[in-house]
Each structure stands twice: as structure tokens, then as C-alpha cells.
Amino acid sequence: MSGQVKVANEGIKTNKRVYESNHNRAEILDDYRLANESRYASQLGRREVLTGKGKFGIFGDGKEIAQIAMAKVFREGDWRSGYYRDQTFMLAAGMFTLEEFFAQIYGDTDIEFNPGNGGRLMNNHFSTRSLNEDGEWKNIACQKNSSADISPTAGQMPRLLGLALASKLFKENTELHSLTSLSGKGNEVAFGTIGDASTSEGHFFETMNAAGVLQIPMAISVWDDGWGISVPNKLQTTKQSISAIMAGFEKDENGDGFHIFQAKGWDYEDLCRIYKQGIALCREQHVPVLFHVSEMTQPSGHSTSGSHERYKSAERLEWEKSFDCISRMRDWIIKTGIAGAAELDKIEGDAADRVKKAKRTAWENYIKPLLQKRDDFLKLADVTTCNCAKTAKIDHIKHDLRIIAEPNRKDIMSSAKKILRLICNSCSNPANSLKINVTAWLDKEMAESRRIYSSHLYSASGEAAALIRGIKPVYSPDSPEVPGREVLRENWDHILARNSKVVIFGEDVGKIGGVNQTYEGLQAKYGENRIFDTGIREATIIGQGVGLAMRGLRPVAEIQYFDYLLYGLQVMSDDLATLQYRTRGGQKAPLIITTRGHRLEGIWHSGSPLSMVINSVRGVHVLVPRDMTRAAGFYNTMLLSDEPALIIEPLNAYRLKEKMPDNIGEFLVPVGIPEIIEKGSDITIVTYGSCVRIAQDAVLQLRDFAISAELIDVQSLEPFDVNHQILESLKKTNKIVFFDEDVPGGATAYMMQKVLEEQKGYYYLDCEPRTVTAQAHRAAYGTDGDYFSNPNAEDVFEAVYKLMHDVNPSMYPKIF
């Protein structure tokens, strides 16, 4: 296709050299100016890093012209899900400034100067702010939007699917048409970008396949410079061309798929044309589009970590100079008579001056507050009349801090802490002592630093889950006993009827109503835009949910079994869990991930790897109900909040009978609040999920031996026991056992740390704490395999009895 651009199923063939653009001379020269500003910014940014003003630099040089062409068709309401090469696009679309470019390099923590992430991410990781300061939605339909970037290659792809699917739902579900601050009836395109090497990742192919199936307005651009750091395309991609191997996805007479466009990264005319043509199809027909932009370059190499001269041949480097996109645009402008060399020279000079000015402004914004902070502290620390032996050491630390030309927070705080250690009680007068003043200053600065660097792991808005109080289920004498799955089904029915933003999806969720019938009949009642099936693609099921939630919907994404969550754990950990944190409260994705887990049958349908999950998804609530009533209450709670959650239904409890609450759909189970299931006085047993019923059996067995056990269902692993109820039980019993079916040292160790260290429960122990867990291996098949792999009531009994024997051997003699 070197001479033509093919648009499948449209019969359009256009010679590249026919320039039909409506862009006038001023627009072309403005594009040239912007390309040069972006290139100079890359060069100057690299210099700032290499001279020590920044820690790391990664840039988008070599990709300027294609990104300018793409920005021309990016509208208010549209969304970007891209990566760290997109600085020119962000500048051209007006979502980013040169001052912000340098503020990112310096790590400026002032949201005014670095609004995308407040200094939490390395440079060229972009985002716009979807939320007001109070955490409420802005009018995102009237602004251009960029979802928050992450570094993992292809990590932007799963969320892109959801951003595009949202447009389809906003268009086809008329109940959503009134939500004009979220969407203009689905007239938005989700733009994705990815490097050619990253298309080798599974996330890319999974997303592309799903987009082709869903037929959604997703436009993905592949920036192809021929390399993945030092690895060339021939070792990355079959046929060395992503468009060639994606040809089977192309829309044609045999069925739906993608429109596929190709162009060269240096061909301004062609790039403007294909983006205008391709995005029009994408927006108007809601069909996905792939733009493969090849013959791009990377003039300064991958990043500031090294030079591409180490792995590119002299011939390749010379080719990159000849085919540099800005040089080619300059040649084209001169050749066509749009402007002469002198005029372009002036544009280039003005661009360089503009970038230098932006750098100076950004640096002053960053360094002045730090210099002031340093000087204020030194002034405070100079107030002393003491002549003790440590004064010289204090003076030395102050001198070293004073001569640092460009101090950072670490320099100042580290010096202050070292000085505090050396201050004696006689320094200054007691009422205004140096120790008191420095301590107060440090406390204030540490609090401020926590706000700057550690806020917004969870929601700070008025809709935070922790603020939602519980409402108990209400029962009457006539409340029927039904299988637990019916409680969930009726609860979902009430949710779908009440909230038009809620959409539920997953494998087998739609037509058959879920593998355990918890959504039975709901697709027929509410339609395929509210509850629907997906393919077997866990990573993009979660990513789909992330993107939908970022656009203001309330998605519920089902992962059929907890064991298969691992396919999507990277998306949860790197994208969903970090979103509010990495944007410092600028974006949110209140996604509910529902799954079923714990013991049932065989290695891959009996998993309970909670420690792996809770330690990788901080930022997501992890809720572990013991039955379907508690699960329903958690769904109701989280749908009132603006935070993401993973809710794990007990896999072996769908057929167990539970009373149907009279207030179905309205009762709420609060997060972070355990429930005491059995009161006792001798020992505390702490567990959750499917283990609760096993523990209840063990409690009955223990009673026969005069042991009174207090059984506590934690219900919520993250957050965990926020009111320290377990500690109060331990104060009474002075003995504790933590029980679950995770691996040894897993979630039981997590719970133990929370109670003994964080809650200071250690001081109330009469004997060592115990854990009862599964074996280190996966659960074997069959009843006996489960019995000898997972902990059972007898294991709990034995652990408790042995502990009681250790405390009082005469009352509890050995029986084992």
C-alpha cells in the first residue's frame, strides 16, 4: 500500500499526492511551529535531566507530525488512552502546555503547575482532570479528555476498550441521553496510541479482537519507528508489519471488523487526510479504526537512560536523519511554495525561544518555594544560645544545606531530622526551645508531604465508601427462605431498575443469567445494553469496566471464577488501583469487580489467593462476604460510593438457603466492619468468606470440650476492622487464631499484622498467636483432596485445643 490508502468496504482509493486538505497557509505554518516547539522541548528536556534537574526523561520526538494530524480531529468529549510518546498530540489538542511539560520533568507537586499528576508520575505521563476539588464530576462532555497514562507497555489498551464502549452505550440506551455532562449521546471517539513493539503484548490483541466484535468508536494509532528499545521489528512482529498481520481484522464483505489505514510518519498531507477520513468513519458509523503510521524515527533514542547509537547502525541513523518528519515537512513547505527558508528559520527560532521561556517559568515555579522552605528552616534553626559540644555538628549540617544551590524536599527534611537528633534540652529558653520549634516544623512538613505524596489512594470525596453507614436487612415472619442466588438476583433487579448507569457484563452473564443464575431473566427484562455477555477475555473485561467507569457509568464486571482473576490482575493493580492516587484525585473509576471464589472443586475452581490480591490492589476495596445476603449488601454500598471494589462471592453457597430480606436492594453492609458471629470468652477466631461456616462447625466441637470461642467474620479485608473490634475481643480472651484457606503466610499473616501490630493487640496476648491455613500447594481434586489440602473444622479444633493446652495443660490435657 505504499502509494495508496485503502478503506475497506468503502471502495475509496486516493492517490497520496493529491492534496485535498482545507488547511490554509497559516494553519500549516502553525503546525510547523508546534512541531518545532515539541522537538525543542524534547531536546531541552533531555538536557535538564542529564544536568541533574530531572530524574528521568522520556520523550516523543520523531512522532510530531502524525500527532498534529491526529489532534485536528480530536473534539470536546473525546478521550485519549495513550502512552509516553504523545507530548505533541497533547500540546496540539490543547490539553497540555510547555510549562507543564517541564513541570513534569522537575516533579513539581503543585497541581496548578502540574495538573496531570501533581508530581507523582515521571514525565510525559498525561491526564486531564475529570473531577472538581470535591471529587464530583466536571462536565467531561464539554472538555477534551485524556485518561491517566501508565508505564506498562500496552497497559493503555484494556481501558481504551471501555472508553469506546461507553460511547456505544450512551448512544443506544436512550435512558442515558439526559446525562449531557457525561456524553453527547455517544458522539465521542476513544483515541488510543501504542508503540509498534508494544503491539506484541497480549493486551493489544485481546483489545483489538474485542473492539472488532463490539463495533465501537475506537481509533488506535500505532507509532512505528521500527524498534522496541534495542529490539528491531523483525524480532517483534510477524511480517515486520502490524497492519499486515491485522489484515484479517479488516472490515469487508465477509463481516464487520476494522477500517485499516496506513501512512508514513513524515507525510503531513497524507496523515491529515487519513485521520480526517478515518475518524469521520469511526465517529459516524461507530466502527473501530486502525492507523498504522510507519517510517517514524526516535532521534534521541528511547529515553535518557541510554543512547540508541549503541544498537542502531550508522546506516540506520543516517536514514533517520533523512526521514525526520520535521525536516521532511520543511522541505515540503518550501517545495510547494507555502513559505520560504527564511520564514521557516524565523519560526524555528521563535519556537526555540518559546520553549526556553517555558522552561525558565516552570523552573522558577518549582524551585522558588523550595528555596523559601530551606531559608525558613535555616532561620528557625539558627535560634540558639547553646554552646554544647554538638553545636558544631549542627552548624555543619546547616552549612551543607545552605550551600545547596537547588535543594529538594529530601535535602531539607533530612537535614532537619539530623539537626533534631543533636539538639540538647538547654538550647534556647524552655518556652521557645529549638527542639520544640524544629519538632513542630517537622510535624507540619511531614503532614504536608503526606498530603502531597500519599493522598487519594482511596476517595477523599463525600461519597467515599468508609462514610456510608450500614442498614441491616429487615425480615418479617413471612420472609421466605430461598437459595442464596435468588437473593442476589432480586437485589440486582432492584439495582438495575433504580440506576440507569449500571451495566453488568461478563462471561455467560447475559443470556443464561450467569453460571449460578444470579442474573436469571435480567437481560430479557432490561435489554442487552444493560446486561450482556463477553468473550473469554478477563484482562479486557476489567479494562472495559475501568473505561466505562472513567466516563461516569457504573459498571459491574464479572470474572467468572476468582482463580481467573490473575489474567486481569495487572489491569487491576497498575491501572484501576492507582488511578485516584496517580492523578491526585483528578480521575476516578468506581468499578465493581464481582467474582466467586474459595473452595469448590479442583485446582482452578477452589482458589483463595487473597494475599496476592490484597497486596497488589491497594486502592481497591476487597470484600469477602460469607453469604449472598452480605454480598448483596456490599453491592448496594459500593454503588453508593465512588470507589472501586472487588467482591468475592462464596462459590459453594449459591444453593444454601437464606431468608429473603424485605428491604431487598436497600440494605447496606458497611466496609471495614467485622461481625461477631459467635460470642465467647476463651479465645478469638478470626476468619472470612467460606471459612465462616467451617469455623462455626469448629466452635460447636470446641464447646464439647468446655472451650468458649468468639468467632469474628472480618467481612472486609481492605479496609480491615477500622473500629478495632477484633482488638476488643482479644482484650477479653487474650488468645487468638487467624483462619483462612490462603497459603501459609498469606492473608492470615496480613490479618495478624493488622491486629497485633497496627491495633497493638500484641500487648494483650497470653500466648503466641496461631494461624490455620491451606497447604502451600493448590487444592487437590475430590472430597478427600479438598479435606487434605484445605483447612477443615478438625484443623481449627486442633489448633485451638493445642493453644488452650499450652495455656492450661491441666484443664486441657493432651489428646493428640
What are the functions of these language-model segments?
Residues K138-K144, G155, S433-P473, R618-V622, ...:
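Helix-enriched interaction subdomains in cytosolic or periplasmic regions
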Residues E64-I68, N145-E406, I412, V503, L651-F816, ...:
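Thiamine diphosphate
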Residues Y83-Y84, A154, T193-I194, S221-D224, ...:
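Short beta-strand segments
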Residues Q587, G597-E601, H605, L610, ...:
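Active-site phosphate/pyrophosphate-binding segments
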Residues Y40-S221, G226-G228, P232-E250, I603-H605, ...:
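Cofactor-binding active-site loop characterized by glycine-rich and histidine/acidic residues
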Residues M1-A66, K72-V73, P299-G301, S305-Y526, ...:
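Conserved acidic/glycine
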Residues I28, Y32, K53-G54, R75-W79, ...:
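Short coil/turn connectors at secondary-structure junctions
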